[in-house]
Amino acid sequence: MKKAAKIVLLAVLLALVGGIVYAVMVWPVNPTRMKPAESYEQLRDTVEKKTDIRVPGEDLLPWTVTERQLRMDGPSRLAKVSGFALSGTMEHGGVAFSAEVSVGVTGVVGDLPSPWDVYHYVPVYLFQNQGFYMTQLYIDGSEYIIQLHYPENVTLPEEDAAYIENTLQAACHDIIDLYS
């Protein structure tokens, strides 16, 4: 075989191997962009080491945490951590709630209502509907969201609704205090 043919064959083989390695590295391994964390400690250490995001304690809400996930900035093996989500359940007044605390890097999109609360100069927004409460706050370029869902056919008594709002407000204050 001539020397030129060997060089061309070697170049083709290297390109083929490079293409395969690239495909393996960018093939979606986390199509939902979420990756399970083995423990709270692993989640906190990973997020705080690789981002500027602070992770609140698991006792942020009166709940049982059932799932801990790292939010990734893409679906591939090369994706980097960009936030987290803690999910769980809580109960109050005989009503079961599913709860989630999540954070990711984002920018404010669209018009926001007037703040529900302002704590240490950070506005906190409350959205509520039948079966749903959500708070949202932006601090140091990160968007924190706390969501509580309950059955839509349940009407919360005033004192239970006040308890939920006070619990959400205290949780938001705890998150903001992490940055103080």
Regions found by a protein language model. Name each.
Residues T32-Y40, L178-Y179:
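Intrinsically disordered, low-complexity repeat and linker tracts
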Residues P36-L137:
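Short, solvent-exposed recognition patches
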Residues P31-M34, I145-Q147:
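Substrate-binding/catalytic groove segments of enzymes
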Residues T106-S180:
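A short, solvent-exposed beta-edge/loop patch
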Residues K2-K3, T46-V47, D160-A162:
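Compositionally biased, low-complexity segments enriched in small residues
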Residues M1-V17:
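N-terminal Sec-pathway targeting helices
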Residues G18-R33:
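Membrane-interface motif at the C-terminal end of an N-terminal transmembrane signal
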Residues V26-W27, T51-D52, G94, N153, ...:
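Short, flexible coil/linker elements and helix-boundary hinge sites characteristic
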